[in-house]
Amino acid sequence: MPIQIQPKKENIYYFTLSKAPDFVNFNFEENWICETVYLQSTHEYLYQLSQSHDIVAKQKALDQLVAIAQDTSTSPMTKNKIIHAFQQEITSNGYWRYRQYALVSLRKILTLPYDDYTTTMLLNLIISEKSWLKASAINMLGNTKNETYVDIYQKALYDNSDRVINAAAIALGKTKSIKAKEILIALDKKPSWKNQSRISSLNGLEQLGDTSTVDFIIECIKDNQSPRWYLATPVWDYPFAAINTLVALGKSELAYPILFDRFQKSLQDNDLNDIFQNVQLIDLLNLEQSKEVYVLLQQKFKNDPDILKTISMYESNFLESIKK
């Protein structure tokens, strides 16, 4: 129903209806650029979630219902209604990205252990879906840390999607299964773009927490030649994933000699990219002895005020991190 807004402080509109609406889909798809305050009841949000044809309104309903479910004053009956509504959206024929958003929303309000309906829903999603939605279902099932699903995770390691493989590796590590170590180390050899398989292997080993995998992790750190993304993040760059895994196992000191030698070579080569990438890796170790790196940096760049500013910033962040 079109309306016109007059240039005045307050506009009032009246609509004649046969009964009060279950929800009002105000500002359909947010085509009107504005800020609004529009209070709705739990019933209205639930109805909006199930009946609206506006994907933005449905997403807003998910967000608001998550907040309601997380409110300690919300009754168990109301929370169960919200959970059921989310499950209906997840198993619908809707667009996969929206259904994934609904699944992530459900994960925010569910506590372990999951009931049979939720577990079956996740298992069915893993069988029938792919990529993002399948990975999200594996992530959620992985939170159970249940060894029963080891074979499901192992099968998912052969998926075409790196996202699914990564989720499966992490879930497998969480089970602490005696089979996980061998499976995860073998994953490193699976061909992948820029060694994504290695990153997934390391992520899984981090969750497994088995210190007998340290030798493998050290070999990954020593490998400075394999294809990789130079993005300085454990999500995309395997040396950073390896350092994170080693730190999680409480063995960070084993990587320091490797990285310090590499850092010294980068200083000799005057390769700024290598210098600061090595600094980032060394900083992740959170070791007191890493302070010597900053002494060498300040000596190397004592005549370059711009680089000294960058060094100062790195050092400040490092010193804060080792205080924790």
Predicted features and spans:
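Short solvent-exposed coil/turn linkers within tandem alpha-helical repeat scaffolds
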Residues: 92-93, 191, 249-251, 269, ...
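Non-catalytic accessory/interaction domains
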Residues: 1-120, 124-134, 165, 321
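Amphipathic alpha-helical scaffolding segments comprising HEAT/armadillo-like alpha-solenoid repeats
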Residues: 38-48, 72-90, 112-126, 146-158, ...
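Terminal, low-structured helical/coil segments at or just beyond the last alpha-helical repeat
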Residues: 293-324
